[in-house]
Structure formats: C-alpha cells, structure tokens
A protein has these predicted regions:
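Positively charged n-region of N-terminal signal peptides that target proteins for export
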Residues: 1-4
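Phosphate-group recognition and catalysis centered on beta-loop-alpha active-site segments
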Residues: 19-297
Length: 297
C-alpha cells in the first residue's frame, strides 16, 4: 500500500516532540474509518490531524477523477477536496476549471455543454496528456457514491450549488460527510440552511490581514463555535497569530492549506518536501492546526 507523505511527516514531527519530553514508540499512520474521521472532525479538543487531499491524488491520476479519489482513500486520508461545475443540462461534474480545455482532450465552457457532450472527451494527466486509463469526467453523484462511508469530502464551490448538492447528498445518505466553505456573511449562510431540515457542514474562510474579512471574522466569532476556520496567511505576523489564538479559544478547529506559500506563510508542501518535512509540518501543527490540506499525498 502507498504511504501517505504528509501523515508520515506529521507522525515524525509528533515523535520529535514526544522524544524531547518522554520516551515514545513510533507508529505508522493507520487508515481511518468514517466513524473515526467524523469523530475527530467534530472534536475541537483532539490533537489528531485531519489530512485533506487537494483534488485527490492528482500526481498519479487525473485530478478530480475517480481513481484519484480511490487512491487517497487507500492511503488512509481523512478527506478529499474536489471541485464542481454545472453543465448546460444541470449536471454537477467534477472540474476545477470552468472550461474542459486543461483537463480533458476537448475544448469548451462547461456551462455551455451538456453532460453527454463532455463525455465525448477523455481526462488528461498533470502532464497534459490523455490518461492511459481512458477516464471520463465524473459526476458529483458518482464521486460521492465512491466516498460514501469511506472518506469525508471538502466540496469546493459547493455553496454556489447548495440546493443541487444537498439533493444529491441526501439521496446518497452522505450529507454528514460533506463540508463546504466560503467567506459568505453569517446571515446569508444561516438563511440558506434554514431552508432545509438537514444541511452540509460549513466552514468560514478568513484571511486575517484582509480588511474586508475582519468584520466577517468578528461576526462568526460572535456565533456559536464553528466546526473549523480556514485561515489563510502569506506570513506569520501578530495579526495572524491573534486570529489563530481566537479561533482555538472559540472552540473551533484550525484548517491551514499547505498548497503554496501565500496560503501558509511559506510553510508549504514543496518547502517541506525540499527541506525538512517534519520541521515544516511541525510548525504548522504547533500553531494548533488540526486540519491540513495538502498537495503531496
């Protein structure tokens, strides 16, 4: 079985800390079941780090493809991040881009194409060549069926299609496994959720140094504790440190993206890979982070 790079690095960082305090035995990360993942996701007091895989295992398979999702499940990941777009005939498909140009062998705007038209083309790998697996762009329903009872899902752009997404998650029985996020006003999110009996999980995204986000942050902090906050920062400064402290003191979990430097103050996956992974990820964890989105599964 493939080993999960970030999980191993976090385990190593934890071991380094433990060794400085008391003798400890190193153990490799184990694959989680959905009950364990959800328990950790909803527990702000646990130190267990939830690992989120950005667009699945896109280094080995086409991004946002079923094999890319299956791969991170086999690795023992806790959550997979996938992106959605809406076709001309109102089918939610997995794609980060609004066009099919980069990720498939075809060209065109997704919102101007039917699902059947998109299915004429094949997914490309990260190298820009057609996948030898002859993969087609999957629907959200197909992807969530694969994830059911196996892994949680962060659905990028999920709020934009909230009602359609919820219809699918309720049909499949995976609503409690799906997390969406955004920088929407508190009142808007509350009004949307009041329309439904069951709701998707929601997480505010805050950039502490963004002046427009400061009142938004205060509004969310004034409410009951959020499941988590995604905090974005291009450097670690007093403003960021204060925001992190307030998130943790509020009883919420802290989510940090290590995808590229401007999201995590230079503590990115590539820096970790090229220098000291245990040290870089260790700094992220020492901040109080218990959810990390990575590009290095």
């Amino acid at each position: 079985m493939k080993k999960f790079f970030l999980s191993l690095c976090i385990a190593a960082a934890a071991l380094m800390t433990a060794c400085s305090q008391a003798p400890a035995e190193a153990t490799a990360p184990k694959a989680n079941n959905i009950e364990t993942i959800l328990k950790n996701l909803h527990d702000p007091k646990t130190n267990q780090v939830i690992v989120v895989c950005h667009r699945g295992d896109w280094r080995n398979y086409p991004e946002n493809s079923i094999p890319a999702i299956e791969s991170v499940i086999k690795m023992g990941a806790d959550m997979v991040e996938i992106d959605i777009q809406l076709t001309k005939d109102s089918v939610l498909v997995l794609s980060h881009d609004r066009t099919i140009n980069r990720c498939t062998t075809g060209k065109g705007n997704i919102n101007e194409m039917t699902y059947e038209e998109i299915q004429q083309y094949y997914l490309k790998t990260a190298h820009g060549t057609r996948s030898s697996l002859d993969l087609k762009m999957p629907t959200l329903e197909e992807a969530l069926a694969v994830c059911k009872d196996r892994i949680t899902v962060n659905l990028d752009k999920g709020y934009d299609y909230y009602d359609l997404v919820l219809e699918i998650t309720e049909k499949l029985g995976v609503t409690d496994q799906v997390l969406i996020k955004g920088s929407k006003p508190v009142a808007e999110v509350q009004a949307k959720m009041a329309e439904h009996k069951n709701n998707l999980l929601y997480m505010p995204v805050i950039t502490p140094t963004n002046e427009k986000h400061k009142p938004l942050f205060e509004d969310y902090l004034a409410e009951k504790p959020q499941l988590a906050y995604e905090i974005c920062f291009d450097e670690i400064n007093p403003t960021v440190e204060s925001a992190v402290k307030r998130v943790l003191e509020s009883g919420s979990k802290l989510w940090v993206n290590t995808l590229w430097n401007s999201l995590c103050g230079g503590l990115s996956d590539d820096i970790a890979f090229e220098t000291s992974a245990a040290e870089v990820y260790g700094k992220i964890v020492d901040m109080g982070t218990t959810i990390i989105q990575t590009d290095r599964p």
